[in-house]
């Protein structure tokens, strides 16, 4: 059995304070609740409230994860944050999170890989723990998508939300944690999705939804099958698959290809919308208490770049 590094000690999440339903969007966009829910599976999403930002969401999620783990921030020796919406070019969100939770002075870095960001960051955290360069990592995925999306654009404004998720990872004894990772990117497909800097209203997020849908429906099952095959496990040994929450139709189409039972798929896009790098860790609080030791979790991310990544975690 391969050794595993990055045992989950605790998880936490934070959401934008404004609940925006499909009915709310009907008032400002040429759309309907039925049109949105049928095509995306989204019923509502969260937008930041006054005083909230990508940074405040990341800090709140991190604090909750540490509290859930029952460990102080000072016990962490590395903070890694996946985000594409830091409101400032520098300092990093991770630096601000570390200072806020009492982990100032330790390593801290942001990682940007769009909606695949958390899966990428998990591979970095796992590698740092496996190498011994870190013994306890605070791993965060946070995005304020409303800072880069034109919320009055019917094609994109209906899709995205704001949130953050965090997990405390311990090096552990090698029995539980990340076992394997897949990383990939193809810059030739960069024109399929772009966005300007947060707050830059002149360059709001654009995506070729049709082509990205095709890419995701192909890549999602390919990564799941590949990471299972090279580690010699079957779907029966997988308790959960947590995909990036881009669109319920993508998840459903990929699940049909894999012939995955519905109960193995973790879905929150209906409640939170597409929260980019936050979407995978936002799922952890919903499943943490029922995790079965010895089973596996597969996380799958895909996003602009185009980027893709998968992680195999042994519970």
Curated annotation (Swiss-Prot):
Pathway: Lipid metabolism; fatty acid biosynthesis. It is an enzyme of class 2 (transferase). The keyword Cytoplasm applies. It comes from the Bacteria. It catalyses: malonyl-[ACP] + acetyl-CoA + H(+) = 3-oxobutanoyl-[ACP] + CO2 + CoA. GO terms for cellular component: cytoplasm. GO terms for molecular function: 3-oxoacyl-[acyl-carrier-protein] synthase activity; beta-ketoacyl-acyl-carrier-protein synthase III activity. Its EC number is 2.3.1.180. The keyword Calcium does not apply. Keywords: Acyltransferase, Cytoplasm, Fatty acid biosynthesis, Fatty acid metabolism, Lipid biosynthesis, Lipid metabolism, Multifunctional enzyme, Transferase. One of its GO terms (biological process) is fatty acid biosynthetic process. CDD domains: KAS_III. The active site is at residues 115, 244, 274. It is found in: Cytoplasm. Residues 245-249 are annotated as: ACP-binding. Belongs to the thiolase-like superfamily. FabH family. Homodimer. The last Arg residue of the ACP-binding site is essential for the weak association between ACP/AcpP and FabH. Catalyzes the condensation reaction of fatty acid synthesis by the addition to an acyl acceptor of two carbons from malonyl-ACP. Catalyzes the first condensation reaction which initiates fatty acid synthesis and may therefore play a role in governing the total rate of fatty acid production. Possesses both acetoacetyl-ACP synthase and acetyl transacylase activities. Its substrate specificity determines the biosynthesis of branched-chain and/or straight-chain of fatty acids. This is Beta-ketoacyl-[acyl-carrier-protein] synthase III. It comes from Rubrobacter xylanophilus (strain DSM 9941 / JCM 11954 / NBRC 16129 / PRD-1).
């Amino acid at each position: 059995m391969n050794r595993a590094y990055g045992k989950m000690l605790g998880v936490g999440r934070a959401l934008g304070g404004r609940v925006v339903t499909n009915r709310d969007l009907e008032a400002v966009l040429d759309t309907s609740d039925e049109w949105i829910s049928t095509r995306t599976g989204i019923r509502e999403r969260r937008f930041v409230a006054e005083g909230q930002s990508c940074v405040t969401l990341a800090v709140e999620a991190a604090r909750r994860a540490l509290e859930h783990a029952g460990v102080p921030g000072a016990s962490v020796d590395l903070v890694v944050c996946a985000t594409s919406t830091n409101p400032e070019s520098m300092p990093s969100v991770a630096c601000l999170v570390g200072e806020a939770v009492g982990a100032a002075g330790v390593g801290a870095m942001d990682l940007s890989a769009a909606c695949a960001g958390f899966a990428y960051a998990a591979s970095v955290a796992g590698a740092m723990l496996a190498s011994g360069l870190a013994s306890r990592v605070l791993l965060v995925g946070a995005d304020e998508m409303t800072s880069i999306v034109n919320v009055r654009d019917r094609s994109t404004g209906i899709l995205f939300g704001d949130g953050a998720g965090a997990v405390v990872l311990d090096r552990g004894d090698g029995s539980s944690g990340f076992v394997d990772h897949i990383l990939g990117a193809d810059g030739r497909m960069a024109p399929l999705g772009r966005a300007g800097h947060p707050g830059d209203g002149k360059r709001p997020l654009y995506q070729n939804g049709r082509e990205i849908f095709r890419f995701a429906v192909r890549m999602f099952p390919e990564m799941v099958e590949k990471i299972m095959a090279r580690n010699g496990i079957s779907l029966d040994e997988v308790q959960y698959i947590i995909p990036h929450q881009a669109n319920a139709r993508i998840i459903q189409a990929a699940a049909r290809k894999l012939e995955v039972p519905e109960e193995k798929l973790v879905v929150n896009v209906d409640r939170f919308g597409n929260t980019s790098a936050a979407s995978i860790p936002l799922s952890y609080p919903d499943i943490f208490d029922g995790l079965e030791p010895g089973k596996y979790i597969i996380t799958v991310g895909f996003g602009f770049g185009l980027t893709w990544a998968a992680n195999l975690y042994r519970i």
